[in-house]
Amino acid sequence: MGHLHIVHWRLTMNGAIAALFLCLVMVHQQHAVRILAVFPTPAYSHHSVFKVYIEALAERGHDVVVIKSTDRINYANRNGLRGNVSEIDASLSQEYYGRLMRHAGVFRKRGIVADSSTVTAHNYMGLVRMMSDQFDLPIVKSFIEEAHKHKFDLLITEAYIDYPLVFSHLFGDLPVVQISSGYAVAENFETMGAVSRHPVYYPNLWRDKFSGLNVWKQSMKCTLSWRYRMNLVNWPDEQNALLKRQFGESTPTIQELRNRVELLFVNTHAIFDNNRPVPPSVQYLGALHLHDKRPDSMYGMVREFLDNATTGAIYVSFGSAISSEDMEPEFIEMLLRVFEKLPYSILWKYDGYMNRMPANVFVQSWFEQYNLLHHKNVRAFVTQGGVQSTDEAVEAIVPMVGMPMMGDQAYNMNKIVELGLGKVVDTVRVNAEQLIEAIVDVAESPKYRKRLRELRHMIHHQPMTPLQKAVWYTEHVIESRRRVVPTMLKTRAANVNYSDYIMSYVFVPFIMFTVMNHLRQLLKMNMV
């Protein structure tokens, strides 16, 4: 009899455990969703940010399909995730991207430096056509043609170009989360109804000068910003024409697709964007790729070189997008003269051939930058000013000398100078003496490290980490979609056109009435 009671108890417990497990599975299935992520820019630094975000969503149990454009990042190589990450490899566009950058007139001065004149609708449309060609690759095209076989609940796209928003239409009216790997552009903020443009407080990202400007130079920069805006005014129409040619006449316009964007993630700390006033639908993250990252021990020749750098070491890298073969010989010779005269050991990320190399210089085509910056003997970082590089320098408390070369790097390094974290030089005009002076000042003065410590403490002193914030807000959009309710994050000004935003329907009639009234008065006077 007792044996029967034990058997009955075991059966009851097994049933309860099975029921509990079934409930957990049902709850998990109820909240886990399928996500489509489209990242069409084949830049390593961009994908290193997106990978952390995608893995975190998979860790929460969501299934993610990633259309990726580089073979240097593998989104599906981590075991133990609760969800699943699968890839559609469109990395053939990487060669296209390199060719586009070479032929777009971007790298002009000293072989590697772009100026604001290269930010044109023509060059932007080159990037859009690259994406269009990417979406025509057989593997991507087949995936699109079988859209009826796939059910997705959310689309994640890279911010700054809106062409990939078309996937929200192709796969069934999906809500969209846009994420930038660094700063967002003015058009992204306009989509969200945030403050987007101001020549002083929220200037154009593509400018190369920001401080020490007299009234005349400031006026010229304002004019440049206006020309940039006017140059791109017809850009959405060109994208619309391409969309309809590629995906059919029923394809919504870019302006219509922007209405589906529920959330914008900006992967910089808000202070670097002048603490821009934004609605809740815009969330600043910052250093997403450094989540839970700790420096690993280094071994081999790099470790030995750094350990022996008793007078200090300087790390020199111009990022993953710059090839040494593009540098003009004059620029390389200038750098070599600087290295020879510096009283430090130099580690230089350089992938070209060199006839001579100073004895104090150690060259490799690739360094584990994050680990290297944490070595106790590293005194300064000579950098192009990319967002991920400056994030790593802040985390390692290494002051910077900026030599901006393209994109948002001049803007980013201007903020580094404003915050007292380093110095910046004019990459086009700098000579050896000026660069030596900047490096020695940054390496020797304690004020830069003091400000770096203060800033690092401030950006760490947050209620949640950047990755936790990204996941929480993403799941808020998902939950709103599931419950068929608005996210309540967006402002009424989201994606409003300029004429409505400035209330032209109010002041234009008023101006016309005033002008007509003055004309009437003049006519009366003439008649008298």
Swiss-Prot record:
Signal peptide start and end residues: 1-32
The keyword Glycosyltransferase belongs to this UniProt entry's keyword annotation: yes
Family as reported in the entry's similarity comment: Belongs to the UDP-glycosyltransferase family.
One Pfam family in the UniProt entry: UDPGT
PANTHER family tied to this protein: EG:EG0003.4 PROTEIN-RELATED
SUPFAM superfamilies listed in its UniProt record: UDP-Glycosyltransferase/glycogen phosphorylase (SSF53756)
Keywords, ordered alphabetically: Glycosyltransferase, Signal, Transferase
CDD domains assigned: GT1_Gtf-like (cd03784)
UniProt source species: Mamestra brassicae nuclear polyhedrosis virus (MbNPV)
Role summary: Catalyzes the transfer of glucose from UDP-glucose to ecdysteroids which are insect molting hormones. Expression of egt interferes with normal insect development and block molting.
EC number(s) recorded for this UniProt protein: 2.4.1.-
Name of protein: Ecdysteroid UDP-glucosyltransferase
